[in-house]
């Protein structure tokens, strides 16, 4: 049984019903419908913390989804799961793949910056200032891109850029 049919709360049930109605009335191919179903089930599993199930659904959705814009959100969500699991290298890979398909994902740039900043902080603790500087430079670039896409958002990143004298 698809996950969308087993969700217990009212909002999830309502969202599933609306999504099913939209899938019936909007002209889409069966592959697009199937990809969306896997994506929706992945989001549901992810929101419940069932990351393994979410990844299975997202991987299947990426196999079926042909639209680059839609694929970008699937890849972004895979990146979120890898970030949550502490798999930062994999997360960066998926965020980058998402941005390749949709360069207007400020949240992906922000998450990439957070990971780079974290790695820079780790390098500082390990006494490697050269590596720390490289990671911090990369974090700054990603935060600048996120801020450029959504001015007024990412206030903490904006403040860090000013304090670190990395904002032009």
Curated annotation (Swiss-Prot):
<keyword id="KW-0802">TPR repeat</keyword>
<dbReference type="InterPro" id="IPR011990">
    <property type="entry name" value="TPR-like_helical_dom_sf"/>
</dbReference>
<feature type="repeat" description="TPR 3">
    <location>
        <begin position="120"/>
        <end position="153"/>
    </location>
</feature>
<keyword id="KW-0793">Thylakoid</keyword>
<dbReference type="InterPro" id="IPR051685">
    <property type="entry name" value="Ycf3/AcsC/BcsC/TPR_MFPF"/>
</dbReference>
<keyword id="KW-0934">Plastid</keyword>
<dbReference type="GO" id="GO:0009535">
    <property type="term" value="C:chloroplast thylakoid membrane"/>
</dbReference>
<comment type="function">
    <text>Essential for the assembly of the photosystem I (PSI) complex. May act as a chaperone-like factor to guide the assembly of the PSI subunits.</text>
</comment>
<feature type="repeat" description="TPR 1">
    <location>
        <begin position="35"/>
        <end position="68"/>
    </location>
</feature>
<dbReference type="Pfam" id="PF00515">
    <property type="entry name" value="TPR_1"/>
</dbReference>
<comment type="similarity">
    <text>Belongs to the Ycf3 family.</text>
</comment>
<dbReference type="InterPro" id="IPR019734">
    <property type="entry name" value="TPR_rpt"/>
</dbReference>
<keyword id="KW-0602">Photosynthesis</keyword>
<dbReference type="InterPro" id="IPR022818">
    <property type="entry name" value="PSI_Ycf3_assembly"/>
</dbReference>
<keyword id="KW-0472">Membrane</keyword>
<feature type="repeat" description="TPR 2">
    <location>
        <begin position="72"/>
        <end position="105"/>
    </location>
</feature>
<dbReference type="GO" id="GO:0015979">
    <property type="term" value="P:photosynthesis"/>
</dbReference>
<keyword id="KW-0150">Chloroplast</keyword>
<protein>
    <recommendedName>
        <fullName>Photosystem I assembly protein Ycf3</fullName>
    </recommendedName>
</protein>
<keyword id="KW-0677">Repeat</keyword>
